[in-house]
């Protein structure tokens, strides 16, 4: 069941209109991105557009395939634009992503793209990051204790291994790493937070997107 489906559908229809012939488009995850992909597939059929898509997860790659759309990779092409959802967006367009767990590949495709659209309904707009959602990090399995110790010292926060629904143990990423979630208790500058995360040994990536020139599209 998709929450706020009407608002998300409206955003999806708007973003699909940006597609032009022979473009390469990066596809993020989340329900709004999925609805946008469906709208893009309709546009491909209706207007006969030749589009190539770069997926950020196996799940999205499966959807692209089911819709009969063409796929490529970052090794073969550079995205003209990228679209994705977000869990939180602050007033300076810093964002937290990653409830789906694909944020490392999402950040790769985001950084590779010329134009970046973040599609959210108004419930995702916050005064400061961490207000509603924890910050997800991807951690090398052997480094869980080391990362926990470092973040307790640097942030005063204890990350928790994200439990996997339906099976024992934690969520494993497509890279074979563990996802941990950090509850951000105090208001902290996103650039400073990014620096702390990047300087923590054992973390391979985070759902904090800061310093990107993004265009936020909301209902």
Per-region residue spans from a language model:
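Conserved phosphate- and dinucleotide-binding cores of soluble alpha/beta proteins
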Residues: 3-10, 58-219
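N-terminal active-site beta-alpha-beta segment that forms phosphate/nucleotide-binding
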Residues: 1-84
């Amino acid at each position: 069941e998709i929450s706020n489906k009407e608002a998300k559908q409206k955003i999806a229809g708007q973003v699909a209109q940006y597609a032009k012939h022979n473009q390469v488009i990066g596809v993020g995850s989340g329900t709004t991105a999925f609805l946008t992909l469906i709208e893009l597939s309709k546009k491909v059929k209706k207007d006969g557009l030749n589009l190539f898509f770069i997926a950020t997860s196996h799940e999205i790659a499966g959807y692209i395939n089911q819709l009969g759309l063409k796929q490529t990779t970052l090794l073969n092409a550079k995205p003209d634009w990228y679209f994705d959802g977000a869990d939180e967006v602050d007033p300076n367009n810093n964002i937290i992503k990653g409830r789906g767990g694909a944020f490392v590949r999402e950040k790769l495709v985001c950084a590779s793209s010329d134009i970046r659209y973040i599609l959210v309904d108004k419930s995702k707009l916050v005064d400061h990051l961490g207000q509603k959602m924890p910050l997800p990090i991807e951690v090398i399995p052997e480094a869980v204790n080391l990362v926990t110790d470092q973040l307790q010292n640097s942030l005063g926060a204890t990350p928790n291994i994200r439990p996997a629904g339906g099976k024992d143990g934690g969520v494993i990423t497509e890279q074979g790493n563990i996802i941990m979630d950090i509850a951000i208790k105090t208001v902290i500058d996103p650039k400073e937070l990014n620096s702390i995360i990047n300087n923590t040994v054992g973390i391979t990536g985070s759902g904090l997107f800061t310093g990107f020139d993004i265009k936020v599209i909301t209902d």
